[in-house]
Amino acid sequence: MSITNGTSRSVSAMGHPAVERYTPGHIVCVGTHKVEVVNYLAEGGFAQIYVVKFLEYLNEFDNTASVPLKIGDVACLKRVLVQDENGLNEMRNEVEVMKKLKGAPNIVQYFDSNASRRRDGVQGFEVLLLMELCPNKSLLDYMNQRLSTKLTEAEIVKIMYDVALSISQMHYLPVSLIHRDIKIENVLVDAKNNFKLADFGSTSTCFPIVTTHQDIALLTQNIYVHTTPQYRSPEMIDLYRCLPINEKSDIWALGVFLYKLLFFTTPFEMTGQFAILHSKYEFPVNKYSSKLINLIIIMLAENPNLRPNIYQVLYHLCEILNVEVPIEDKYAEGAYNFSKYTQFQNKLQNVQLQMYQLQQKKIMQNNKLSDSEENLLNDMFLSSFEISSKLPMNASDGHAAVSRIPSQNVGQELEEEKESQSDQRKSTLSEDKSSRTTSNANSSGTANNPQEINTIQSPGIEDKSIFENKTPGELYYPSVSELDTYLDKELVKQSSDPTISEQSPRLNTQSLPQRQKSTSSYSSGGRSMKSTSYGAATIGSDEALANEKTAGINKMKQHKSNNPFPKMNVAYHSTNELSNDASNFFLEEQQQGQRYQQAQNQTGTQGNTFPDESQYQSRVEQQQQQQDQPKGPANYSQRNFYTGRDRSNKPMQLGGTIAGDSGNRRVNFQNISQNYATNSQSGYLPSQNSPAIPMVRPVISMNQQQAQQIQAQQLQAQQMQAKQQMQAKQQMQVQQQLQVQQQMQIQNANNNGTYVSDRTNHTTEDMRNAQGGEPPILAGNSANEPMHSSSKNEALLIELSPLKEDAGKQSFQDTNEPQTGGIEDAGGSGTIKGSNNNRNGVLNLSLNEMDLSRDDTGAAVSSFSSSSSSASIQQAKLSGRKGSSKRNNYSTDELGDSMVSSESIDIDLDDARRGKTAERRPLHNERGHKDQARSSDASKSNQFKSKDFSSVSTRQPRQSLDLNFQEVNLSSPTLTQEHRNKNDSPAPNSHHSYRVSPHASTAITENKRHSTGHELSTRSNGKHETHRTGSKQRHDLERYRHSKDKDSNSSITISTSTPSEMRKSFARARQSLDLERVRREAMASSASSSGGSNGKRRSFFSVFRSEK
């Protein structure tokens, strides 16, 4: 074909490639007709319309038209480009329909057609259709010319008559055809101003009742493609009504057509498909005759059985025109009986009014009605059963249909029916067809007969159907049991990411809305129905009713979809997906919390045994990771922890108040490490605004890994302490001390030989005990553990709180707080004393002088238990020292008697070697005065002697301790308080050597006080407190200088020596920058002090006091 203008236009709005137009004068052969293009007329989505002039027949013998074209006649050429065989078949269908309607009145006439493959190298076909030309364009153009004046009633009747007559030609065929796309745009106006029906591309035969989901899906897609939304009938929109799509659908479209002729808009323009389903519309104020209005009313009846047939429509129009009906009554029903419709409508409206009144009464009476009124209400639902019965599934088709296409649940159906009820109540003033009463009648049965609903089962649904026919994008919602199994596995992993099962743990598959898909931008059928979720009880509400239309039918009706075009919404997903990230996240947290509680309850019943070392190691690693970052000690903001039950954002309290404070028990802190790890992963970081302990990053602290491990050990130690007996506690303390000594021996190879082995044995035993959940609980710990005031409280908390993995961290947290009164007020001082007495047997001299006995012993036990759970013995030793210091805080009366103080001193020396000694030794500033009196009681120290300590004494751990303690001038229990004051003052002063904020220093002093070795306390504090000194020497200097200069930093009263002694100690501190020198002096003094005159031991600090 020659192209002269060179212009090209897009063939369709769907993005098809541009196609060149025919130019005027172009010759085209259509079948046996040769035509010449006169001009381009219009273009549609797939077609181009030309005005052509008939030239000649290519074959006279092929001319079979009843009214043949004459040469020179003008015709219309429709050029359609189709992409595939499907498009070609549709065009073939249109041609066939037009051939059948050739010669019929008010139908656009067909002349000829031709189909061929495209010649421009593009895949597809070109279809040419030659037909009658209507020069006055379409009815839409005709109406657009009358926008201001509107159409007169005569014009409307004329148009309706012509269109109804054309439709009758289709309905009266031997096999009735339905146009399915009757609308203003498809009516053309010929040269004589007659109105003719065109565009038969959507025409089809009547559709049988479809009952299977697959058939419904296919028909839904077909309807969507070939019909116009505003003209669709209710049975087209809701195929689950199982109503036939036949000539009555054309009658509905014709009623919308008439409404638009009157009011230039469709009745459902502003309301949508649900208004169509219930035929809810209104008439604007108008001056049209009631005959036209009534005709609209009966044609727009929701019940297709109440709509007139085409003969009755024509009869009514002819009655208005006062002409004879041009067709005979094929249906033999005569004229439409308006009285019948009025009677039906009045009855329906009366029932609706009564139902409305009963519903209002029910609401006023708190949803209660008498039995008679309830039965009446149900009967009214039945009596308002307006639409033809919803046919259940065929027995043969139902099983297969259900197995491959699920239905929605009854709950959704009931909600729909309630909506229809409200629509019915509101429809008493409308003249349109009765509202959808089938669902109303059914709702009465389903709502009031739940047993029937439960007994009716879907014939084809099996459990496996839930998993079948799931498309890749389909979501699966497991059952609760599956979720439990999944959570049990995930609990070990402690994954912080909510899974799908966790997002919707309580959802049944039947409660999920039907998922909708689309195979194309305009398709709504196909296999999408297979992807919908299965309902456990897919029951048609009609089956629950004893309605005569459904009685005796054992098949099941799947509930209809609210969305008549389920395949359109590609991105449509379950409504549950939006709320999963938030609510299910907390479901997950709650479930995990419950499992933690269960695990704790189990541990509590089993004697509060601790997890295996491997598990504990993993937890310690988590704690270490947490502790690598600066953070508040352990009293994090409670809102950061989900699993805790008794958490409060209160600052750490003194031991005296904490002892009985169950509200501040360590419920939350036991699980801090894990919680913090998971919270940090999920974006929740613990608050660093710890109320009592300022967070400081240690500049010069022990190895962070060790410190972290020590903290973790402390946390666990306290936890284990809550469950053990005093004897076991004492043993644990002794073992911790041994561990401390062993560490010092490892560091100081000179003295460590036998002592290390002894300590190693004890540490292993302690670790076993700790794993067995036997580490003793010292009442003194209550002072340090505001969250665990007593073992009783701990037992309760175990049930309520998550697993107690952070006992070490608890003690650490507690020690950070100032506890001036806590030492004396600690509830468990008596028990601590007993333990301390045992230690005094071994370390009477050192402990009495240092006043660390009780605190150190308690901390030693706790830290030892924590260390026992950890893999490293050194960590255990360090933790033992720290833990002992904690316990010493609880009862300062017995400080002088415990080995812990000596051990703590050893630890301090080790730390000094590391640059930490000066920092970690802060001995009890508070103890200074209190401990003097307490230490003065040698009898107390003797009381503290125990079996365990006696065994320790045989080992003579003194040698390792002597290095550190002899300089402290630790004396026998009979030492004068003056010596004690001296010893105590430097220790707390050294404790203050940390240049930390007043609160931090206070916490540090207490921590050091609590920890015998002071290392543990300093380490734990070191995590949270910054040592501002820049070097080891600097630490030593600052320790001793600030121990005296900055005693005010500590909330604990410090017993200081005379000013001259303080000056001398400062001088010594300056001279002690060389730690090696100090160590050598300590070693030298250890030998002399062990057998020194007066039977006194010389402590590390004695180096600074020697020159008085």
Curated annotation (Swiss-Prot):
Enzyme Commission code: 2.7.11.1
GO BP term, example: negative regulation of clathrin-dependent endocytosis
Record cross-link Glycyl lysine isopeptide (Lys-Gly) (interchain with G-Cter in ubiquitin), residues: K1008, K1046
Keyword terms: Acetylation, ATP-binding, Isopeptide bond, Kinase, Nucleotide-binding, Phosphoprotein, Serine/threonine-protein kinase, Transferase, Ubl conjugation
GO MF terms held by the record: ATP binding; protein kinase activity; protein serine kinase activity; protein serine/threonine kinase activity
Entry's Gene Ontology cellular component terms: cell periphery; cellular bud neck; cytoplasm; prospore membrane
Domain called Protein kinase: residue spans: 35-319
Modified sites of kind Phosphoserine: S10, S407, S504, S541, S574, S801, S846, S953, S960, S1048, S1072
Modified residues (N-acetylserine): S2
Composition bias type Polar residues, residue spans: 493-513, 781-791, 810-819, 935-976
Protein residues bound to ATP: L41, A42, E43, G44, G45, F46, A47, Q48, I49, K70
Modified residues (Phosphothreonine): T471
Biased composition (Basic and acidic residues): 419-435, 910-934, 1006-1048, 1071-1082
Biased composition (Low complexity): 436-449, 514-534, 590-629, 859-872, 1049-1060
UniProt-annotated catalytic positions: D181
PANTHER family: SERINE/THREONINE PROTEIN KINASE, SERINE_THREONINE-PROTEIN KINASE AKL1
Protein name: Serine/threonine-protein kinase AKL1
Organism field: Saccharomyces cerevisiae (strain ATCC 204508 / S288c)
